[in-house]
């Protein structure tokens, strides 16, 4: 099998050296070239035709976003962004994902060499995932039309969503059409700390429903969406007649914190047939067992189809485990989940 050919673009000579060490330390990939800025990278892309590009967000001559926008328009290819762990860095990274980047890695704030080398396996996994990703599925999406509100729903009704690679844009596509009368939506998206708050704030500006980073102990309200905070598990709990959010520091599940399985298992336990579960694009199997538990508890469960996924890992695993009621294109997910929950069809006969 041929190696994954990687090109790294970063204005830091140290970062270029570190990325080269990381990539070349894995037998299934190789660094074919590095570039100090996008203008040099443009020529190297033509020369080496890499499978994956790693791209620094902030660079001289042309910043990473401008370059990414041109690249995805003229020569679409898998891109993994390299971002700083700052408020501004998270906003720029989310914009990069919107423009078509597959994923991102964050630079440690201290001890760059030691920190990046510690991330070696994670970086390699993201590069492998990017090399297999569907670029055509990751074109920026137009804002969808708002769906018509169904009948007033009981506060018992609930939608739970899980996603990973490619999920930020998929979640946006699912939430934007939801009317204010929608049931509560609770979401686990694999993301590091700091990024989930920026992600929630970005969605809140784009959606009719309110979107926020979830907080421990808050009540779950209709017309609101709650994003699990980075590096924390989120679970659904009961507080009398109401649903409540629990945030905790439990060990990683399926190597993830937050974990979709943790959320889905809690929804199966506390919401049962009053819930609709949705599993979107993502690598790995997180959420598959939890979705089966939701299905067995009477929930209607939806998996995104392969054609519209950036990475069809998590939905495939959920389908293979037998916990999926229906498989639909991303463009139909919002409509289907509202139709099922509004018609009371979260309950399977």
Swiss-Prot record:
EC numbers, comma separated: 3.1.1.61, 3.5.1.44
Gene3D superfamilies, per the entry: 3.40.50.2300, Methylesterase CheB, C-terminal domain (3.40.50.180)
Subcellular location: Cytoplasm
Residue ranges annotated for the CheB-type methylesterase domain, each copy included: 152-344
Catalytic activity: [protein]-L-glutamate 5-O-methyl ester + H2O = L-glutamyl-[protein] + methanol + H(+); L-glutaminyl-[protein] + H2O = L-glutamyl-[protein] + NH4(+)
Modified residues (4-aspartylphosphate): 56
The species this protein was found in: Salmonella typhi
CDD domains found in the cross-reference section: CheB_like, REC_CheB-like
Ranges where the Response regulatory domain occurs: 5-122
GO biological process: chemotaxis
Record-given protein name: Protein-glutamate methylesterase/protein-glutamine glutaminase
Matching InterPro entries: CheB-like, CheB_C, CheY-like_superfamily, Sig_transdc_resp-reg_Me-estase, Sig_transdc_resp-reg_receiver
Keyword Phosphoprotein belongs to the record: yes
Known function: Involved in chemotaxis. Part of a chemotaxis signal transduction system that modulates chemotaxis in response to various stimuli. Catalyzes the demethylation of specific methylglutamate residues introduced into the chemoreceptors (methyl-accepting chemotaxis proteins or MCP) by CheR. Also mediates the irreversible deamidation of specific glutamine residues to glutamic acid.
Positions of the catalytic residues: 164, 190, 286
Listed SMART domains: REC
Keyword tags: Chemotaxis, Cytoplasm, Hydrolase, Phosphoprotein
